[in-house]
A protein has these predicted regions:
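P-loop NTPase nucleotide-binding core
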Residues: 32, 39-44, 48-156, 165, ...
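Conserved nucleotide-binding/hydrolysis micro-motifs of P-loop NTPases
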Residues: 33, 72-76, 162-164, 200-205, ...
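Sensor-1/coupling segment of RecA-like P-loop NTPase cores
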Residues: 149-151, 155-156, 164-211
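A short helix-turn-beta junction within AAA+ P-loop NTPase domains corresponding to the substrate/partner-engaging
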Residues: 208-225
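A short, basic N-terminal segment
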Residues: 1-41, 59, 245
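Conserved small helical "lid"/interfacial subdomain of P-loop NTPases
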Residues: 224-251
Length: 255
């Protein structure tokens, strides 16, 4: 590694330390087709837990699809729908012809289109030809489930910075349509879509899930524990050793 330790992005494998319990819990929940929420301050390790869990499931031979939509710059309904749709479609196809075919197949009767000029200019797979309405939201939210059912494979949809949906005037309608979908979940169905909801603005996430009680009993919350100091120290020491340097454990402790 170029630096003693990774700190500027999510980590998996040998760079992932601690929180094995959280990974086990998340894996079991995904195996059961549950929807998951976790939140904490920025850079607290949310995405590392998610990615390590998926890494572990791949290593154990599990077959699944994954879409990751970062909502960090979402400020309105249209931006959310396009981010969501683009992530979901791109995760299961790879060419312009395939993108257009999937949008035509799954999003018929909506205002969603595949715009080749938008795709060429900004890599936008799903575009809108009109102001979105609730039918558009309804069909878009259900898109991962339809793909999972047809391909007979679980589909995990990661929504990062989920709290930003509240910046859209229609956020209440969006949440209620998501709740409707979550209530319809069939635990006996082997191929279903599971949403992994992550948020970095703790107060906003608490407002959604604890104060207003959206998704009440429809999602399972994973609480992140503090990484043990001993694991952190060992990781730092090993990181310096890889780069040919030695650091005393007492120095790491600040003694």
């Amino acid at each position: 590694m170029d630096t003693p330790f990774v700190y500027d992005r999510f980590v998996t494998g040998k760079n992932f330390i601690g929180r094995k319990t959280e990974c086990t819990i998340m894996s079991n929940l995904l195996e059961s087709g549950e929807h998951i929420v976790l939140y904490g301050r920025p850079k607290s390790g949310k995405m590392s837990i998610v990615q390590q869990t998926l890494f572990n499931r791949r290593m154990s031979g599990r077959q699944f699809m994954v879409a990751h939509a970062s909502l960090s710059n979402v400020r309105n309904l249209e931006q959310f729908l396009l981010k969501f749709g683009t992530a979901v479609i791109k995760a299961v196809s790879s060419t312009a012809v395939e993108y257009e075919a999937l949008i035509t197949k799954y999003l018929d009767g909506t205002h969603f289109v595949f715009d080749r000029s938008r795709f060429a200019s900004c890599d936008e797979v799903v575009s809108l030809n009109w102001t979105p309405d609730m039918n558009d939201v309804y069909k878009m939210i259900r898109l991962p489930q339809r793909i999972a059912e047809e391909r007979c494979r679980p589909y995990y949809v990661i929504l990062e910075d989920f709290q930003n949906i509240m910046l859209a005037e229609e956020y209440d309608d969006v949440f209620k349509l998501m709740e409707e979908l979550f209530r319809e979940r069939n635990r006996m169905q082997p191929a279903s879509a599971s949403f992994i909801i992550a948020g970095s603005q703790v107060n906003a996430m608490k407002f959604i899930f604890e104060e207003k009680k959206y998704f009440y009993r429809l999602v399972e919350k994973i609480t992140m524990s503090t990484v043990d100091d001993r694991e952190i120290i060992e990781y730092i020491v090993k990181g310096f050793m890889v780069s040919g340097k030695v650091i005393e454990r007492d120095l790491v402790l600040g003694a």
